[in-house]
Amino acid sequence: MARLRQECGFWSRHAARALMTCSLLLGALHSTLARGEAAPADDLARMSLGELANIEVTSVSKSSEGLQRAPAAIYVITHDDIQRSAATNIPEALRLAPNLLVTQTASSAYVISARGFGGNPNAQNFANKLLILIDGRSVYTPLFSGIYANTLDVMLQDVERIEVISGVGATLWGANAMNGVINIITRASYLTQGSFVDAAAGNQVQELGARYGDRINGDATFRAYGFEFHRGAMETAGGTTAHDGWSKGQGGFRTDWSTDRDSLTVQGDFYRGTENMLDNSDGMLFGGNLLARYQNHGARSDFQVQAYFDQNEQFGPAGGTAFVVHTYDLEVQQTIAAGASNRIIWGGGERVYAYGITNTASLLFEPPSHDLTLGDAFIQDTLALASSVNFIFGIKYEDDPFSGWMPLPDARLSWDINGHATMWAAASRAIRSPTPFDDEVVEKVGPFTYLAGNTQFRPEQVTAYEIGTRAQPSPDVSLSVAAFCNVYDDLRTIEHRVAKSFFPLYWGNLMRGDTFGIDAWGNWQINNWWRLSPGVTWVRERLEFRAGASQLLGIAQAADDPSSHATLTSSMNLPHHTSFDASLRYVGALPEPGLQHYYELDARYGWQVSEKVNLSLSGTNLLHERHTELPAPFGEQITRSVMAEARWKF
């Protein structure tokens, strides 16, 4: 009854807020229609494919360059892509990138991977070979090299673009960028001036958000935002509620100051949430961050210094494990034009993770608290061998407390073909650094220890080879294709003791192998109102145990990945200032634990009522009332979601 009263109170508060907001929106709609004709949708929807190909990206070289000439397999999810989609959070928006595989396992939990290695819960292997950043702030957790998906929330209307690189990015971004880099870039505050309100309600998602931006003086602007949401529970394989619904409130700000040569950005966020558990208890999450970035733009060089603090606290039910991580990061970099044909970027930084873990009788870390200090220095040189041919070579040296100094080199050759196509080839090296979960964990059943960390655990390593092309053969067609081969060594395995007894088990590095495959996607502007965007990734994994491996749990312990996944996105601008966008996705069968292939569909119908008002009806997972994306007992039954939304700018 207490739980019921609490939930009813939550729904009453949100229903009142949503009703008030919808009343304001309907009033604004009536007055706007009385004043005149509705305005067109966002300008980006009117861009040609050629203009989209020249969107500036920064994640490939840590400096601004046109997407068409970037020598990497990079896909850009634009602001307009997100606004027109049915996505209600960042993981759902990432499904728009055909070079990513996003799997939902619970109401607040997602697995995000690129080019394989999405993890295998049977062996406690997590998706840990992908680096995710928000405005240059790493959101990966040092405890197990993965992410907490419940910390990825930003106001989707404030996202400028998401740059998704499939392939190694360690030379510029550091360890754990083994299979890819995701850089979520939010809009400058001068682009978000005025007031904005967003209200949404559906069978699974209820959300209310607001933002206000203004000018401080001639050179400075700011914005402040806040939102609160509730996401309903999924179902278990037995058809009962999974009790995994969750709620979260988040607020933040951003200020931007700029002159002809200098710019300064200061931004921060704070959040608090509650997550229900299968045993009907509650977990909590708290956190926040503060970031400052200064840039100086000179005639022949650019300089940047960035510092941030991040706090992430995850609490299980009363008496359960709690994870607290405080991150302190400082980074400097400089880009120098060393002559007409040479550009050098160099820099370095230091990061400190201060973590504390509340041990339980079944899960312990020894020691339970620790400070991890990581240092790095890098340099990369882009040399123009000819007017259309560039050679890029870089190397980063990174020092972490578990493995010491490690070199992370990268070499690329790119060829710009008449401005309409780019070809590139690359060879790179990256690692996944050891973590407390590898070195310091102790797992027990009663007094019996069945798993212990291994202080001799080594970094997982990959040497990656890639060749690709990006082209626009006609004004209405663009495409990108990349073929890759990744050679892995020292992959994590589960081992057992031989000399004395079978237990405790421990983590080893006795697996190696390779993956190879293709990423491909494109755009076809059928006419001035309809665009189709197909994409596919095919991956083949060939792994083997090294001599001396126990071979417990088999090769499948490394990953449980489909051999292929594909997307087809349709975007239509319809009469009367309406739009219809749909994204169909296919995910191949999982080998072990097994799961059949499936198709799913997300769609949104939007009406740009006026320059200030947008109404929409959207749905996710529309093909099935419920479906499984990860086999039980590790994945819940993901439920179909339908939602109505109203956005109001004033």
Residue ranges of model-derived segments:
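Gram-negative outer-membrane beta-barrel transporters
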Residues: 384-391, 484-487, 508-589
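Short acidic/polar hinge/loop motifs at secondary-structure boundaries
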Residues: 130, 137-166
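Extracytoplasmic beta-strand/coil segments of soluble accessory domains associated
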Residues: 58-75, 91-138
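Outer-membrane beta-barrel signature, preferentially recognizing the C-terminal barrel domain
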Residues: 280-298, 323, 416, 429-480, ...
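Short, acidic, small-residue-rich periplasmic hinge/interaction motif at the N-terminus
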Residues: 36-83, 135, 297
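Structural signature of Gram-negative outer-membrane beta-barrels, strongest in the C-terminal barrel
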Residues: 267, 308, 341, 368-487, ...
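Periplasmic-side early beta-strands and strand-to-turn transitions of outer-membrane beta-barrels
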Residues: 171, 183, 190-192, 211-288, ...
